């Protein structure tokens, strides 16, 4: 029997839950041109924590994993901000009261037998990618719980992505329907178009339709750049954007080689009686060659 690891993109879950819990009070706040009272904030945070814990329980119950981990972003800027100071520029900052509540939510997750992972240097996305790929290389199943499209390039027979809020898997069919390219072409696709969500610029004048058309015709960005039959105007745009495309690719590509320093058995669910016997010695560090 194989292992099944659930990786929860914690802030993706928590921020969405918080927004739903806060929403009923937003209009009241606007009508009175005032901040929410301390008691109201306390109730919103209490509801957020309870809803997140209930979501965790539902996820475990639905997917029946043998192992699970919630992965958090650090509150400190990651390496991508050092590479590009405009990364995620303009994105709404997490409210301090919610940021201060994260440790309590982590503790609540731990009470359910699910530990948390955070890195000061790397984003949760990089940690999740490293874990997912490591498990997949060992032939084990991974399900990533997130709505973040950045995980889509990881899709494989052993790596699945589940949107908890819309109750659906984000699969190859979803990628083709939304972007009109293959999963293996997504990084090239976003390198050309840019990623507005994270404020990553692409090639000026190339949108999703053109990018998809080029990738479907030539197969990859490398092949596009080597093509000799491009229109002069397009070839010029690409030539002028080589440096930007290199930066975009670095920002868009998730790390898969972060040293983690623990074994699969460390994150097994104690409620899974067989989990201790299932591949319990898989070393989730990058120096494991087994």
UniProtKB/Swiss-Prot annotation:
In terms of Pfam families, this protein maps to: 5_3_exonuc (PF01367), 5_3_exonuc_N (PF02739)
Q: Where does Mg(2+) bind?
A: 125
What is the E.C. number?
A: 3.1.-.-
**SMART domains listed in its UniProt record:** 53EXOc, HhH2
Instruction: Describe the location of the 5'-3' exonuclease domain by residue ranges.
Output: 181-275
The note on the cofactor says:
Binds 2 Mg(2+) per subunit. Only one magnesium ion has a direct interaction with the protein, the other interactions are indirect. Binds 1 K(+) per subunit. The potassium ion strongly increases the affinity for DNA.
> A Gene Ontology MF term for this entry?
magnesium ion binding
User: Per the record, which residues fall in region Interaction with DNA?
Assistant: 205-210
Which metal ions or organic cofactors does this protein require, according to UniProt? Mg(2+); K(+)
> What UniProt keywords apply to this chain's record, in alphabetical order?
DNA-binding, Endonuclease, Hydrolase, Magnesium, Metal-binding, Nuclease, Potassium
User: What is the similarity comment for this entry?
Assistant: Belongs to the Xni family.
> What does this protein do, in the record's words?
Has flap endonuclease activity. During DNA replication, flap endonucleases cleave the 5'-overhanging flap structure that is generated by displacement synthesis when DNA polymerase encounters the 5'-end of a downstream Okazaki fragment.
> What NCBIfam families does the record tag this protein with?
PRK09482.1
- What is the protein named? Flap endonuclease Xni
Origin organism is Colwellia psychrerythraea (strain 34H / ATCC BAA-681)
Give the taxonomic lineage as stored in the record: Bacteria, Pseudomonadati, Pseudomonadota, Gammaproteobacteria, Alteromonadales
Which gene does this sequence derive from?
A: xni
């Amino acid at each position: 029997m194989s292992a099944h690891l659930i990786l929860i993109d914690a802030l993706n879950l928590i921020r969405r839950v918080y927004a739903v819990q806060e929403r009923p009070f937003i209009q009241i706040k606007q009508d009175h041109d005032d901040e929410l009272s301390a008691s109201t904030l306390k109730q919103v945070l209490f509801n957020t924590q309870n809803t997140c814990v209930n979501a965790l329980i539902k996820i475990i119950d639905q997917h029946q994993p043998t192992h699970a981990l919630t992965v958090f972003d650090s509150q400190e800027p990651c390496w991508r901000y050092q590479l590009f100071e405009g990364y995620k520029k303009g994105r709404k900052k997490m409210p301090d009261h919610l940021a201060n509540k994260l440790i309590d939510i982590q503790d609540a997750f731990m009470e359910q037998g699910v530990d948390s992972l955070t890195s000061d240097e790397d984003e949760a996305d990089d940690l999740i990618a490293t874990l997912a790929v490591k498990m997949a290389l060992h032939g084990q199943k991974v399900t990533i719980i997130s709505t973040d499209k950045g995980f889509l390039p990881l899709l494989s027979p052993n790596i699945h992505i589940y949107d908890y809020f819309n109750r659906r898997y984000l699969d190859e069919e979803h990628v083709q329907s939304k972007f009109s390219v293959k999963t293996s072409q997504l990084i090239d696709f976003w390198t050309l178009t840019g990623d507005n969500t994270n404020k990553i610029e692409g090639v000026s004048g190339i949108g999703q339709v053109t990018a998809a058309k080029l990738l479907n015709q030539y197969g990859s960005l490398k092949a596009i750049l080597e093509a000799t039959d491009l229109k002069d105007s397009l070839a010029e745009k690409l030539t002028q954007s080589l440096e930007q495309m290199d930066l975009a690719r670095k920002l868009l590509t998730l790390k898969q080689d972060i040293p983690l320093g623990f074994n699969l058995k460390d994150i097994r669910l104690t409620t899974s009686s067989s989990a201790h016997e299932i591949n319990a010695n898989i070393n989730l560090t990058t120096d494991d060659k087994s």
